[in-house]
Amino acid sequence: MIEASKLKAGMTFETADGKLIRVLEASHHKPGKGNTIMRMKLRDVRTGSTFDTSYRPEEKFEQAIIETVPAQYLYQMDDTAYFMNTETYDQYEIPVVNVEDELKYILENSDVKIQFYGSEVIGVTVPTTVELVVTETQPSIKGATVTGSGKPATLETGLVVNVPDFIEVGQKLIINTAEGTYVSRA
């Protein structure tokens, strides 16, 4: 059992009614009067629906045991993403709604980890950083410095990140997948 106050983004737990829930965001909130509450943005792993809720810090949940196996992202067709276990070559279908955030960071044939809850495939984990190519951005400004405010750049997966002014179309960038931010040029 794990207390609500110990839940952090990325953790998965099971509710009393059997729902498998992943924490997307968690924060402590202390109102002017009353006790501390935990505000959370959660996703039902099986349905993909997201919702906001609050818990008392002492509420307890059953932490889900999640296993991961190495895999490769194959392709997306309609509302399904296809992955292959790189050890057994088994293929898995995952609804896009369950992995839409992760798909922003991976290209076909990218290495990922498939998450299992028992024998049920519930999602994927992407590397902490990925290399992606800039497909669209404003032209560089002559004399731009690193300390500038930056500009938006669209990457090959469709992800838009804020980058320094000196970045140009065609450059390969390292992106932090936890925060969706520019790290450096590759």
Swiss-Prot record:
Its main location: cytoplasm. GO terms for cellular component: cytoplasm. Pfam families: EFP, EFP_N, Elong-fact-P_C. Pathway: Protein biosynthesis; polypeptide chain elongation. PANTHER family: ELONGATION FACTOR P (PTHR30053), ELONGATION FACTOR P (EF-P) FAMILY PROTEIN (PTHR30053:SF12). Involved in peptide bond synthesis. Stimulates efficient translation and peptide-bond synthesis on native or reconstituted 70S ribosomes in vitro. Probably functions indirectly by altering the affinity of the ribosome for aminoacyl-tRNA, thus increasing their reactivity as acceptors for peptidyl transferase. This is Elongation factor P. Keywords: Cytoplasm, Elongation factor, Protein biosynthesis. The gene is efp. CDD domains: S1_EF-P_repeat_1, S1_EF-P_repeat_2. GO terms for molecular function: translation elongation factor activity. It is found in: Cytoplasm. It comes from Streptococcus gordonii (strain Challis / ATCC 35105 / BCRC 15272 / CH1 / DL1 / V288). One of its GO terms (biological process) is peptide biosynthetic process.
